[in-house]
Amino acid sequence: NIMQEAQDQNFISDHTKIDVRTKVINTTDASGKNIYNYDVEVSYTVDEEYSATDDFAPGRFKCEESNAALAMLAIVKKALTGDFSKYMVEGKQVKVQITGMADALPFRRTVAYDGCYGDFDQEPVYKNDELSNITVTEATGISENEQLAYLRAMGVKDYLDRNIPAFGKMRTTFDTYIEVSQNKGGAYRRIGVKLTFVDAL
């Protein structure tokens, strides 16, 4: 069991709950062929009294700055190099949906962005499931929660690029989703990942 092993190795603490949901979806491809896609969705929650230590602090976006985010990504890595590696087939199609979330805490000033994930100019992004675009560069810095949510998502992409080389051999597409809550608090500053292995079964 991935979760148990991760807990034993202290990837995750008792107060971070990581949820891995899988489902098989019967659909048809572009040519009308009947195929089965395999969906893997990973999310997490943190016990309220630990949110301040384990969730992203206000204005923070690097995965390393959230114990819970890093724990979730460690689980994703473990799954993709272990139990789910049989779906990581060279030349096969995988769709990766990454979600960055931000809360409603207003910005008092622009926060510096060190350009660690590159500059983003008019990049396509799904905001509340509607296709939109976003700009955040070292020069602009971060002045709104949408940008913060986007950089949290880019941290996920960066982690996957660095830790799962198999994606480079697959036909991998990344879609970025951002969610900005009306509420304030660490519970609304999180990340999520959904993988769809196309024609996997």
Feature names for model-found ranges:
Residues Y44-G59, V96-P106:
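Short loop/turn segments at strand-loop or loop-helix junctions that form parts
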Residues T27, M72-V96:
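Short amphipathic alpha-helices and their capping/turn segments at secondary-structure boundaries
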Residues G59-A68:
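Surface-exposed cleft-lining segments at the edges of enzyme active sites
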Residues N67, A71-A79, L151-G155, Y159:
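Extracytoplasmic/secreted proteins, especially bacterial periplasmic and envelope-associated proteins
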Residues E5-A6:
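Catalytic core of IPPT-family isopentenyl/dimethylallyl transferases
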Residues N10-I12, D19-R21, N26-Y44, D54, ...:
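Periplasmic OmpA/Pal-like peptidoglycan-binding modules at the C-termini of bacterial envelope proteins
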